[in-house]
């Protein structure tokens, strides 16, 4: 009910007027709506449109699934603006509403809701959601905002619609609202028809509908329309669930004074932080690992799902709905919990279970640290206190990270015995550190527990249609995690999980709309390159040196349309056609990138406007770029790129070496558009060039080093590549210059105007130039480079007779002078890198 408390705001904007409401609903105006201070009109009429959702169910004779009381849910949703006249739920939702906003309701909010005024009605129907990303400020908050893509239209979420636009589209907004309202009402009724689903699945289904339809709807059009109805409603539902649990434990649900008391501690914040990700992700044996693509894909996916599993276990043990999970991205989990007498004991018991499982499965390399704050009063979430509250959460998290696996070590000591002493048969060939066991054999290879299940899961992820969480017996394809939690991936109809009664949570990836259940959808960065008809037509030449019928280690079938490419094939995609042959070196590039200054963005980026609702919105917006927008960008623009991981605020991609610098530049430009070209939100990246047989752990380390070099540049927002750090947009010495000059030189080489040997000569001239211009110890003998350069240039591109007569240099000389940086002012361009 708390989650639906403002659902009527969408319907109100979609239907346009209370005249569109059924008379039975319209007659409740005096019952549900408060009056303005002067008493001459009713305000907050969106509650009538929320009432319409329940009227729709009544009209079709529907009840809520899982025994949920339609009356209680309805009362919680519609009474929050007049709680003194309704049931006790109204007080809980009203208080949760204020806490989620980080402030009390302003008087002008009520005054602005004069729905009978045509100007006001047109205003709220034509005011778009402002991107929360455009509100981030790391510099002077008084600095004028730059123009950019700042406005969202209220349309269903997909990789294209989540990108903000520069235009407000005021004329189109009423039509958008009408279409979205119609779709939401239809899907709401359809969700409620499925009476066999559990309460948890129903809750997640409602959240799923909201993620699809509410993300682009402003929760308020009065003051700061930069928090969506989705994010505000999630925060309100989290506070309401915890208030209910807290007061229920003290038998105070019927005590409005206790509910409104903001000085008494009622909440806790919990953060789960997965540490050791980088080492655990790239823990590979020194020899060539069979199935490495699968294993890495599954590892990165599982590491994201471990925090999901922890959140599921915690809320089920505490009997809380899914709304209490505030943020979940990038290996971190943030939850709002009720303050109760059993909270610390319950969390400690969960910590022990998680530590035991993590220590034995990952041999101490990976830890999920749970930091729990001290009890927090409601006033700690108001805007003037939220900074202090978040600092408490950070301190609790850091304290937990300093004691990884502490619960396991207290009980068992530092030596792992069970797996290493019982049934071990040498080291695992995949990770090289954990014990191999014959019980975990797939495709004739025995591995450790973790690598075995990663290998199996990695085969299924590219075709994922459903991700289900089970509480109860699974089947042979289910993966047991800690506590009672099991994970089951479904890839097609033949793979359907039969025991739906055991499913306690689940979702479908974006793009799997044809799968009818579960209703919840999420973006997931699982794009991998596959063979298409053009690849197969060119296979005999493009993939020269590879067996044309080579069995793909991904698909376990001959190379064919739709089969997943191996790293060797991706490397070969770097080659380019030259007549009837393909030329170039088959190499890979590893791209690692992340958002700059993330701590500052969440700590101070929203200034005085920090609230739980805004922080939730900011976290989701960033995560959706990497999990929702990026896969679409790869599939449509860079289809030969392999996703190792992407989510939260960072990514790791592997692709053909020739395309990766261009991909990085386009990625930075697209991220800038997504963020409204906000200078406070920037991206840095590092690229490493490697062979297809290079161990990926070393490749990732090299990309990480390049990324760190980029972040060492003042202002960050740069690309590290081959020992250089380039600004993204500088036309004189940045990435645009590099791409332009390298493409120009490639064209000369391809047309055979310039021999490859001459390119190496240019590099030798640059070496001499650097020695001659060394600011510490210049070499005067190296100054001869200029004469040698001029001689070789004149021999390779001699002037024509007309140019000699006119004493004019060939135009191509100027191009080479620019390539060598002879016309540069200030710092030299990356000439060596371009060549």
Q: What label would you give each PLM region?
A:
Residues 338, 349, 353, 372, ...:
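Cyclic nucleotide signaling catalytic output domains
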Residues 405-502:
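Cys/His-rich short segments
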Residues 55, 237-248, 301-320, 348-358, ...:
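Alpha-helical scaffold within the catalytic cores of cyclic-nucleotide enzymes
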Residues 311-335, 361-365, 370, 472-504, ...:
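Conserved helix-loop-beta segment at the catalytic/binding core of cyclic-nucleotide signaling proteins
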Residues 716-835:
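Long, compositionally biased charged/polar accessory segments in the mid-to-C-terminal portions
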Residues 1-165, 172, 179, 214-219, ...:
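Divalent metal-dependent catalytic cores for phosphoryl transfer on phosphate-bearing substrates
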Residues 69-80, 268, 321-336, 363-382, ...:
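A short glycine-enriched loop-to-beta-strand structural element that forms part of the catalytic core
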């Amino acid at each position: 009910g708390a989650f639906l408390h403002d659902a009527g705001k969408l319907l109100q904007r979609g239907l346009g007027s209370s005249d569109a409401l059924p008379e039975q609903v319209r007659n409740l105006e005096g019952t549900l709506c408060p009056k303005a201070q002067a008493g001459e009109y009713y305000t907050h009429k969106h509650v009538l449109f929320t009432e319409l959702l329940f009227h729709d169910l009544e009209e079709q004779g529907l009840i809520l699934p899982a025994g949920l009381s339609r009356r209680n849910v309805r009362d919680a949703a519609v009474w929050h603006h007049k709680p003194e006249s309704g049931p006790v739920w109204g007080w809980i939702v009203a208080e949760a509403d204020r806490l989620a906003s980080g402030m009390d309701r302003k008087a002008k909010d009520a005054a602005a809701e004069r729905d009978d005024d045509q100007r006001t009605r047109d205003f709220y129907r034509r005011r778009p959601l402002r991107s929360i990303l455009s509100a981030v400020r790391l510099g002077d908050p008084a600095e004028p905002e730059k123009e950019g893509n700042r406005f969202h239209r209220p349309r269903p979420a997909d990789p294209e619609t989540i990108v903000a636009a520069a235009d407000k589209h005021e004329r189109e907004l009423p039509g958008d609202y009408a279409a979205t309202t119609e779709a939401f009402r239809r899907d709401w009724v359809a969700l409620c028809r499925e009476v066999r689903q559990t309460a948890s699945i129903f809750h997640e289904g409602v959240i799923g509908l909201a993620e699809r339809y509410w993300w682009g709807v402003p929760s308020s059009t009065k003051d700061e329309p930069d928090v969506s109805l989705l994010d505000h409603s999630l925060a309100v539902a989290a506070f309401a669930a915890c208030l209910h649990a807290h007061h229920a434990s003290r038998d105070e649900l019927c005590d409005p004074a206790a509910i409104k008391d903001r000085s008494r501690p009622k909440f806790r914040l919990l953060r789960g932080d997965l540490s050791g990700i980088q080492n655990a992700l790239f823990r590979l044996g020194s020899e060539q690992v069979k199935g490495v693509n699968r294993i890495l894909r599954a590892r990165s996916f599982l590491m994201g799902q471990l925090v999901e599993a922890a959140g599921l276990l915690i809320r089920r043990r505490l009997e809380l709905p899914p709304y209490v999970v505030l943020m979940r991205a990038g290996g971190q989990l943030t939850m709002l919990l009720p303050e109760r007498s059993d909270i610390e004991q319950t969390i400690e018991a969960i910590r022990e279970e998680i530590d035991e499982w993590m220590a034995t499965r990952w041999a101490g390399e990976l830890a999920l640290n749970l930091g729990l704050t001290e009890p927090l009063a409601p006033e700690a979430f108001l805007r003037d206190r939220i900074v202090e509250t978040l600092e408490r959460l950070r301190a609790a998290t850091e304290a937990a990270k300093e004691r990884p696996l502490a619960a396991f070590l207290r009980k068992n000591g530092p030596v792992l015995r069970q797996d290493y002493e019982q049934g071990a048969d040498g080291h695992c060939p995949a990770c090289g550190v954990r014990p191999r066991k014959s019980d975990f054999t797939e495709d004739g290879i025995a591995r450790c527990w973790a690598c075995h299940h990663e290998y199996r899961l990695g085969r299924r992820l590219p075709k994922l249609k459903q991700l289900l969480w089970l509480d109860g017996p699974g089947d042979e394809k289910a993966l047991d995690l800690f506590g009672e939690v099991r994970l089951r991936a479904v890839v097609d109809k033949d793979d359907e999980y039969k025991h739906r009664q055991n499913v306690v949570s689940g979702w479908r990836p974006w793009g799997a709309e044809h799968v009818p259940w579960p209703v919840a959808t999420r973006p997931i960065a699982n794009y991998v390159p596959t063979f298409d008809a053009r690849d197969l037509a060119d296979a005999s030449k493009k993939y020269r040196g590879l067996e044309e019928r080579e069995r793909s280690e991904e698909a376990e079938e001959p190379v064919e349309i739709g089969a997943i490419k191996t790293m060797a094939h991706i490397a070969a995609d770097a080659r380019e056609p030259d007549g009837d042959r393909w030329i170039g070196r088959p190499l890979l590039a590893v791209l690692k990138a992340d958002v700059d200054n993330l701590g500052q963005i969440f700590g101070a980026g929203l200034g005085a406007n920090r609230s739980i609702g805004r922080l939730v919105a900011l976290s989701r917006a960033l995560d959706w770029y990497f999990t929702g927008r990026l896969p679409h960008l790869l599939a449509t623009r860079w289809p030969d790129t392999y996703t190792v991981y992407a989510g939260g605020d960072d990514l790791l991609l592997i692709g053909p070496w020739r395309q990766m610098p261009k991909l990085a530049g386009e990625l930075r430009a697209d991220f800038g558009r997504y963020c409204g070209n906000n200078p406070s939100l920037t991206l840095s990246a590092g690229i490493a060039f490697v062979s297809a047989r290079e161990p990926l752990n070393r490749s990732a380390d090299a990309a990480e080093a390049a990324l760190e070099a980029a972040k060492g540049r003042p202002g960050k927002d740069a690309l590290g590549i081959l020992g250089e750090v380039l600004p993204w947009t500088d036309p004189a010495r940045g990435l645009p210059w590099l791409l332009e000059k390298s493409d120009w030189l490639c064209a000369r080489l391809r047309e055979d105007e310039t021999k490859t040997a001459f390119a190496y000569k240019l590099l030798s001239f640059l070496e001499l130039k650097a020695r001659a211009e060394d600011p510490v110890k210049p070499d005067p003998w190296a100054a001869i480079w200029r004469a040698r350069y001029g001689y070789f240039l004149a021999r390779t591109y001699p002037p024509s007779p007309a140019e000699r007569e006119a004493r004019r240099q060939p135009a191509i000389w100027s191009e080479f002078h620019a390539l060598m940086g002879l016309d540069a002012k200030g710092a030299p361009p990356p000439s060596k890198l371009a060549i």
